[in-house]
Amino acid sequence: MNTKPLVTIIIPCYNGEKYVDRCLDCIHKQDYTELQVLFVDDCSSDGSVERASRHPGVTILRSEQNGGSSYSRNRGIREARGKYIHFFDVDDQISSHFYERLVEAAERNDADMAFAGMVNEAAPQYTQLFSKERVFTDVEEMMRATYVGKWGYAWRYLIRTDLIREHELSFPLGRYCEDLPFSFRAVYYADRIVTVPGAEYFYRRNEGSLLLDPDRHKAVQADRQEMIADIRRFAREHHFRIPGLEVGRLQYLLRKIRYRLFPPRHG
């Protein structure tokens, strides 16, 4: 009898044709096989859906109108059948032991969230890996361990589905920085979080392209400030501090300055 819990992987995609095969190949190569793969297409105009449909075991959900990553992720949450949920961006990659290590750590420690290491290929100085498994139960300790006020990326977490549904967590629509309020609340409501060595998420997005677009960068910066104000209000209402929040803001500004002074070369 198979007692391994099912993991639902939610992959939002908009015109990600050139990444689809690499993304889904990562999933097919996983040591862990109890997976529900939801590929949520956000009205792509390229061949993303056609490529995804060639891969076995992938459920394709198509949006009737372009709603953004938040809409796609929220739809995936509604369709999830797994005990755990993981959000996987189509242009990134994961190590072959990713889900096996996360699930085993979550089950062994009865954790609501398992926290993966991150390899940031666009900015290696922000890579964060774990050397040992550690369990956190205090809210501020969990905030500090995850640096969720600094890096709110939802794809770093394997999250118990019941936690998301019990607290009605969702991604805010029409936002650039939608991960931050979602991840922040998930960490707050979790009773136990475990850091997991050997589970690496490879973040491959080129941040320079965003920071070199003045109009879009201005919109993202304004949105980030609104999301930070949102989590500050939440923290005040629930009487706790947010470790790493100011550090994250300063690093974001320094990253902006660096890209403007030393634009990345392409080709």
List each model region and its residues.
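Short, solvent-exposed, charged loop/turn and helix-capping segments
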Residues: 237-239
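Non-catalytic, C-terminal membrane-associated alpha-helical segments of glycosyltransferases
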Residues: 222-226, 242-267
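Amphipathic alpha-helices of TPR/Sel1-like and other helical repeat/solenoid scaffolds
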Residues: 226-233
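Generic detector of well-ordered alpha-helical segments enriched in charged/polar residues
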Residues: 140-144, 232, 251
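Nucleotide-sugar donor-binding/catalytic module of glycosyltransferases
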Residues: 1-223, 261
